[in-house]
């Protein structure tokens, strides 16, 4: 009986997760590795690294950039709700951030592309058949961008998308 208990105890120990190789990494290294993963198309791996960066180093430039990159990666992974939540969180935490124009632009894009799928791309879907709430939110984000940041590098594309939506 004692040997069975010892065996079960040892088996339980062997199923523990391996140690996290990123422990001790600087925010710069975490961010660089996440960017490499993004460049390779490994968005889920990048998101995990960016989330680690944000949780380990919650204050400062790297955490702020990680928040934006998480939102972008989720957008590219067609995780609309997660992306919008990340953007809204960033905008609430950093209302005067220098990249707020980008956050507004990304919010507009996420809502603009809300129903763009394979059939919508090749089926010439009529705008009137799309979710009007998402299109309204897209227009509002682009309008706020153009109004608050008229000299932003994102403003010309935002204006073009607004014209398309009207």
Listing of model-derived features with the role each one plays in the protein:
Residues 9-166:
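Acidic, polar-rich low-complexity tracts and alpha-helical solenoid repeat scaffolds
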Residues 2-10:
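Bacterial N-terminal signal peptides
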